[in-house]
């Protein structure tokens, strides 16, 4: 595809559209720096040399959650929250309790364009204000026009299933058969078994009734509105846009393969969406593009060839964006028992490889596992294994012996963060006699990591040691390897998949039974520090750092001349970070961070540092 010329032609056509909102409101005055911001903060994230980087040139890792499945429901009119106050409360908890620095923010086409050709600016205003709540908390945002099973309006009031996405007028435009999934055990089977879903989806991709054109126009107007109604500083925190959730052909044309569909149908759509982003003022932000939904399915009969194999080099305009769910574990049939060490190293390694092959960064924008029901007992191990695979492409059992093979640290947003979990009031498909209240109130799902307690305070539904993690949010140079042993629990059992080897006795003694993370990186002259999120379980006063830069128990406050320091994360939520300053070039650095031994002696710290220095030189030098 000749993308530059295509974009140039489309920009000429779209320039008039891009100005439709210029009189709809004045951009807010530039906001002051967020509480806790330091001189190197508040810069945009872009793609450079196949990595997400900030304005200082540091490698950036985005970690957080999808906000939220509530957007799929009608009860809050396609918004993640009932109010801005709830959004603010949720954002603070996500940052301080959930350890997140980013959210995939769900939007609804149905709510944005309830009448064909008429964008609902009241909806866009409410959505933008809720986004602002996260940006003000120091959480980066990438919006997503979400859909599942194409539209709720395909489904009968008494149906077992529902969808979300396209507006009613888009469904009314087609003469679709009465929906039926036949013999279905899981809602996702509607994608390939429900003729109404299949035909409507195919019509979208083939632009029947001008559906795709209408969607693209609404997407552009939405992006223009957001750009114009956030301050420049706030808009800096918007990372990019996810054009379409979990794309699938619906129905393949005669003789068409899944790979050909990606090449001939899906990719041209992404090029059109990219041009709309440019016209709306998002030209410096990447599109987070997803391959065919089934490209990386881990059940063989579900898998379809894909992964944007024919898209060529994506470069800075795109991020390779995918989902991963362990369908074997979710099935309750194909995976007896629980997940173990290195369970998903291969699956997430494939994501790294495809992102590298396309010349861009990768992200797993959805992953998770049911927290209720017959397979919920697998959740602690499945999620631990998924986070382990985001951190490194190695199993814990082999990490210490070959850390330089660890690979990049992947960005990821867990599904999901819905504070209304278990408190919904959703008339399913508009049926007043079928009001859903439990779980996520959508197709029997229950995956939210958070809920509100009796005092309406957000509380975690999963082990905080699993969710609030140590991770390198910004690396000044190139990551060589990273691992984090979270010691999360499966019931009463503490899961330890990456123990410190006996060949490092002083490091092992220092860590003890505590949590620890270890980052290796090679500096590139960047003056801004390397930054790791400090979980709440790592109080500054009792956190130990052993590094080639020095040792510290209770790191001091940050200054430009302090090599190992701690500081608040921007946003004023109480979350914190470790800052490691090494403004040299081409030097291998390491930092072990642990909450193990209390008040370790200088002798122990020195001995542990000596062991780690020798190990790093041998294994990664």
Feature roles, as predicted:
Residues 39-53, 59-62, 66-297:
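Active-site mouth of glycoside hydrolases
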Residues 1-32:
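Secretory targeting and sorting signals
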Residues 90, 251-372, 391-392, 403-410:
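Glycoside hydrolase catalytic-domain groove-lining segments
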Residues 308-315, 321, 374-544, 567-620:
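Aromatic-rich peripheral "rim/lid" segments of glycoside hydrolase catalytic domains that contact
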Residues 28-35, 617-621:
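Low-complexity, acidic Ser/Thr/Pro-rich repeat tracts that form intrinsically disordered stalk/linker regions
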Residues 50-54, 543-546:
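Short polybasic amphipathic segments
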Residues 4, 330-334, 424-426:
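Short conserved micro-motifs at the rims of enzyme active sites and ligand-binding pockets
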């Amino acid at each position: 595809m000749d993308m530059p010329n295509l974009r140039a032609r489309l920009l000429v056509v779209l320039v008039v559209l891009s100005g439709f909102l210029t009189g709809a409101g004045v951009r807010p005055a530039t906001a002051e720096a967020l509480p806790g911001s330091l001189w190197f903060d508040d810069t945009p994230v872009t793609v450079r040399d196949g990595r997400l980087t900030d304005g200082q040139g540091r490698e950036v890792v985005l970690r957080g959650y999808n906000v939220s499945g509530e957007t799929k429901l009608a009860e809050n009119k396609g918004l993640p929250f009932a109010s801005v106050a709830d959004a603010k409360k949720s954002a603070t908890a996500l940052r301080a309790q959930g350890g997140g620095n980013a959210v995939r923010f769900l939007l609804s086409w149905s709510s944005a364009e309830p009448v064909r050709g008429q964008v609902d600016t009241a909806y866009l205003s409410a959505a933008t204000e809720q986004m602002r709540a996260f940006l003000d908390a120091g959480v980066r945002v990438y919006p997503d026009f979400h859909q599942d099973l194409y539209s709720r309006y395909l489904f009968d009031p008494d149906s077992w299933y529902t969808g979300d996405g396209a507006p009613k007028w888009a469904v009314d435009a087609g003469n679709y058969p009465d929906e039926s999934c036949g013999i279905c055990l899981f809602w996702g089977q509607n994608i390939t078994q429900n003729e109404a879903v299949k035909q409507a989806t195919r019509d979208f991709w083939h632009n029947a009734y001008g559906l795709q054109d209408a969607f693209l126009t609404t997407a552009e107007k939405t992006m223009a509105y957001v750009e114009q109604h956030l301050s420049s500083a706030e808009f800096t925190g918007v990372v990019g846009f996810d054009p379409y959730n979990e794309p699938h052909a619906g129905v393949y044309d005669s003789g068409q393969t899944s790979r050909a569909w990606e090449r001939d149908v899906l990719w041209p759509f992404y090029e059109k969406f990219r041009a709309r982003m440019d016209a709306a003022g998002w030209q410096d932000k990447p599109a987070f593009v997803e391959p065919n939904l089934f490209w990386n399915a881990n059940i063989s009969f579900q898998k379809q060839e894909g992964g944007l194999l024919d898209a060529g080099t994506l470069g800075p305009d795109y991020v390779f964006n995918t989902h991963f769910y362990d369908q074997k574990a979710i099935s309750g049939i194909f995976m007896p028992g629980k997940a173990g060490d290195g369970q998903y190293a291969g699956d997430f390694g494939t994501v790294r490889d495809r992102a590298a092959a396309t010349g861009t960064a990768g992200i797993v924008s959805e992953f998770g596992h049911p927290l209720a029901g017959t397979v919920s007992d697998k959740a602690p191990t499945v999620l631990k294994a998924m986070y382990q695979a985001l951190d490194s492409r190695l199993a814990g059992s082999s990490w210490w012996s070959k850390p330089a093979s660890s690979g990049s640290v992947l960005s990821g947003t867990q599904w999901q963060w819905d504070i209304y979990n278990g408190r919904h009031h959703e008339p399913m498909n508009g049926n007043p006699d079928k009001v859903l209240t439990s779980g996520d109130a959508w197709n029997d799902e229950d995956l939210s990591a958070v809920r509100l307690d009796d005092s309406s305070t957000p509380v975690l539904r999963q082990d905080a040691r699993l969710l609030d993690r140590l991770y390198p949010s910004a690396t000044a140079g190139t990551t060589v390897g990273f691992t984090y042993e979270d010691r999360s629990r499966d019931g009463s059992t503490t899961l330890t998949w990456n123990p410190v080897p006996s060949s490092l006795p002083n490091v092992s003694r220092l860590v003890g039974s505590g949590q620890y993370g270890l980052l290796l990186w090679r500096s590139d002259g960047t003056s801004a520090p390397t930054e790791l999120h400090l979980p709440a379980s790592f109080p500054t006063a009792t956190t130990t750092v052993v590094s080639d830069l020095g040792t510290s128990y209770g790191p001091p406050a940050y200054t430009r001349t302090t090599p190992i320091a701690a500081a608040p994360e921007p946003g004023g939520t109480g979350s914190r970070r470790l800052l490691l300053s090494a403004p040299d070039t081409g030097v291998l650095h390491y930092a072990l961070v642990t909450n193990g031994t209390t008040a370790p002696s200088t002798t122990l710290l020195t001995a542990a540092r000596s062991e780690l220095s020798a190990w790093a030189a041998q294994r990664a030098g």
